């Protein structure tokens, strides 16, 4: 892959992980990149490492609270951080198990047209659920059932175009979560999944190819991490006072654009 292609893929990975679009759906608009397997696995590991670091920096208070909570849980004196950690784990386990089993085949579940249609439908659902959902619940109100349910929904994000952030935020809004709280818990759920994805991919690379650490990988890590941090900060600032409607419109627009590329013979 060229320098520009690495940069574009890293940007898409970083923004797609935190915004309700999904990197797989966005890459459907750039099939010439999606069709280049060389170096993509290593690039994905590097990009996800940067994204994970970005999430940990942005939500450092929650990360610290969960770390302390783990220690207090081991001492038999659970606190808020302990409960938050357990809720995140409850929401992570279903998606982690399924993802570990089918991750390598997930990208073939639908084609470009299917991913485009899913992008459009997801945008419509996000728009509708954001408008219909009341705003009364926060992360502190999370139940075990709610955590496990939202976590299980992440399994659907294995289908290109669904978007892990998109599906969890959409349902959270329908259930009455505050917008920032919906994004926050979605990102907390993402951390162990991103870590698991990176470990699985790295393990496969280590056993089947010779690992080469290059400047391209460092650039991908930095670019994806910075894109994720800026995208997340921007979205959190926006939804503090506004709705998810612009993100829903962008999803719909991306979907229409991909369909146009497919049916006019450019993809």
From Swiss-Prot:
GO cellular component assignments: plasma membrane
Annotated compartments: Cell inner membrane
Gene Ontology BP annotations: cell wall organization; peptidoglycan biosynthetic process; regulation of cell shape; response to antibiotic
Keywords: Antibiotic resistance, Cell inner membrane, Cell membrane, Cell shape, Cell wall biogenesis/degradation, Hydrolase, Membrane, Peptidoglycan synthesis, Transmembrane, Transmembrane helix
GO molecular function: undecaprenyl-diphosphatase activity
Transmembrane regions: 6-26, 41-60, 83-103, 109-129, 142-162, 185-205, 217-237, 244-264
Membrane association type: Multi-pass membrane protein
InterPro entries: UppP (IPR003824)
Additional comment: Bacitracin is thought to be involved in the inhibition of peptidoglycan synthesis by sequestering undecaprenyl diphosphate, thereby reducing the pool of lipid carrier available.
Family indicated by similarity: Belongs to the UppP family.
Record protein name field: Undecaprenyl-diphosphatase 1
Organism taxonomic ancestry: Bacteria, Pseudomonadati, Pseudomonadota, Alphaproteobacteria, Rhodospirillales
Recorded name of the encoding gene: uppP1
